[in-house]
Swiss-Prot record:
Protein name: Zinc import ATP-binding protein ZnuC
Residues that coordinate or bind ATP: G52, P53, N54, G55, G56, G57, K58, S59
Subunit organization: The complex is composed of two ATP-binding proteins (ZnuC), two transmembrane proteins (ZnuB) and a solute-binding protein (ZnuA).
Membrane-protein topology: Peripheral membrane protein
GO biological process: response to zinc ion
Family statement: Belongs to the ABC transporter superfamily. Zinc importer (TC 3.A.1.15.5) family.
Swiss-Prot/TrEMBL catalytic activity: Zn(2+)(out) + ATP(in) + H2O(in) = Zn(2+)(in) + ADP(in) + phosphate(in) + H(+)(in)
Cellular localization per UniProt: Cell inner membrane
Boundaries of every ABC transporter domain copy: 20-235
Taxonomic superkingdom: Bacteria
GO CC term (a single one): plasma membrane
Keyword line: ATP-binding, Cell inner membrane, Cell membrane, Ion transport, Membrane, Nucleotide-binding, Translocase, Transport, Zinc, Zinc transport
Length: 264
């Protein structure tokens, strides 16, 4: 049986349609501030990438956005009826209980056999349908997780390190698939990623997060910014052309904002 690919969704041509707003978000764990003064708007059909140092609050920010974590202060506003697809940073599979890809996808509530077949086709993994989840490569697993995330055709895809465990060629293919997915579903995508050399060619806006939003901008504005070099390192900046934005501050080694000249 030949499976037709997903039919593109025409929700609206408005690119200014707001899906999610975060207003004055703060998150504190045991008196330690994880996020402060976060203001963020996610628009329909946009791709936003969150970058920053380990421990800077990127995954915490996604959890707040998903309403999986209640902020200590601030508001999280979702468009009424917003459908969200989520790919977590890690998936823990019990190797004593093998499960096929098709069965794994079917565990998602209210999904149909045709929708599973269409998702497998979209991500070019039809041949993996009867394979064990536990035996998939990193790239194959990420494609399966993405296929599962779009089964109910979400308006927003939230991805936490979607390229983790995927080789360079696989990362390029996956980013192409994400761009294709945005076109088919007319959805927004927000992701956390460390793969900056590929990210910058495949995103509309970048947020640098280190407890707060240090800076935000489009990829093409950043390549020569001295603060970008300070944040990510001189050698990295020399090898890759990126977006330009402006910090009005620096961080010390503990992630705190420096007052005056920063010696870090």
């Amino acid at each position: 049986m030949q499976i037709k690919p997903l039919t593109p969704i025409d929700r609206s041509s408005k690119t200014s349609e707001i899906l999610v707003q975060l207003k004055n978000i703060e998150v504190t764990f045991a008196e330690k501030q994880a996020l402060q003064n976060i203001n963020l708007t996610i628009y329909k059909n946009s791709i936003t990438t969150i970058v920053g140092p380990n421990g800077g609050g990127k995954s915490t920010l996604l959890k707040v956005l998903l309403k999986l974590l209640k902020p200590s202060q601030g508001q999280v506003i979702h468009q009424p009826g917003l459908k969200i697809g989520y790919v977590p940073q890690k998936l823990h599979l019990d190797h004593s209980m093998p499960i096929t890809v098709k069965k794994f996808l079917s565990l998602k509530p209210n999904c149909s056999t045709p929708s599973i077949a269409a998702a497998l086709t979209l991500f070019s993994i039809e041949h993996l349908a009867q394979n064990s989840m536990q035996k998939l490569s990193g790239g194959e697993l990420q494609r399966v997780l993405l296929a599962r995330a779009i089964l109910d055709r979400p308006q927003l895809l939230v991805l936490d390190e979607p390229m983790q465990g995927v080789d360079i060629s696989g990362q390029t293919e996956l980013y192409q698939l994400l761009t294709q997915t945005r076109t088919w579903l007319n959805c927004a995508i927000i992701m956390v990623s460390h793969d900056l050399n590929i990210v910058m060619a495949n995103t509309d806006e970048v947020l640098c997060v280190n407890k707060h939003i240090c800076c935000a901008g489009s990829p093409e504005l950043v390549s020569n910014d001295p603060n970008f070099i300070h944040f990510f390192g001189d050698q990295f900046a020399k090898n890759v052309a990126f977006y330009s934005h402006r910090h009005n501050h620096h961080h010390n080694l503990h992630g705190d904002i420096c007052k005056g000249k920063c010696e870090c």
